[in-house]
């Protein structure tokens, strides 16, 4: 039997928690490899991933800030910080998995005739990024990552509210020893 209802529990298990279930997926970045310690003068590899939402992805960025550099309270999303672009890693070369020849069937939407994405990274996918931090002096740092979407909007905007999809700017601590 088919039951028609407008009872909110039918499709909204978060209704009582005041979540916005109609928000589009946001573009955001998270760390994957984040070293806790390193030595002064040594390059520091840092990697992460991006979730590509409805706004697409223009770039992933990283920022390293000395812990004793107190950031102004009137810039809670670090819009004036000296962010550096990370490298978005290329898409996989084989998308077909266990399909014959490891190839996608013809005419898969958003893929070209060679089985590669027409645009990378694609919306509603995950992609990886990497960067190498160089020339870091001895000290303690906060390292943050964020995304910029195809509209030029930086994470966590345009909707920084937790109930509309959590996409805070992630941070980790890095100690650089002498």
Model-derived regions, located:
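Extended, aromatic/histidine-rich regions of cofactor-dependent oxidoreductases associated
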Residues: 1-178
């Amino acid at each position: 039997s088919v039951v028609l209802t407008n009872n909110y529990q039918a499709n909204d298990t978060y209704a009582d928690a005041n979540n916005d279930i109609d928000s589009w997926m946001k573009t955001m970045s998270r760390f994957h490899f984040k070293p806790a310690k390193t030595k002064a003068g040594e390059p520091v590899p840092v990697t992460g991933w991006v979730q590509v939402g409805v706004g697409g992805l223009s770039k992933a960025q990283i920022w390293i800030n000395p812990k004793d550099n107190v950031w102004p309270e009137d810039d809670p999303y670090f819009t004036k910080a000296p962010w550096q672009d990370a490298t978005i890693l290329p898409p996989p070369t084989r998308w077909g998995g266990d399909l014959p020849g490891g190839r996608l069937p013809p005419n898969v939407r958003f893929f070209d005739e060679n089985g590669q994405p027409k645009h990378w990274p694609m919306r509603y996918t995950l992609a990886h990024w990497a960067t190498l931090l160089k020339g870091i002096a001895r000290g303690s740092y906060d390292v943050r990552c964020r995304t910029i979407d195809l509209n030029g909007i930086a994470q966590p905007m345009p909707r920084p509210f937790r109930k509309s999809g959590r996409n805070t700017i992630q941070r980790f601590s890095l100690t650089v020893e002498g």
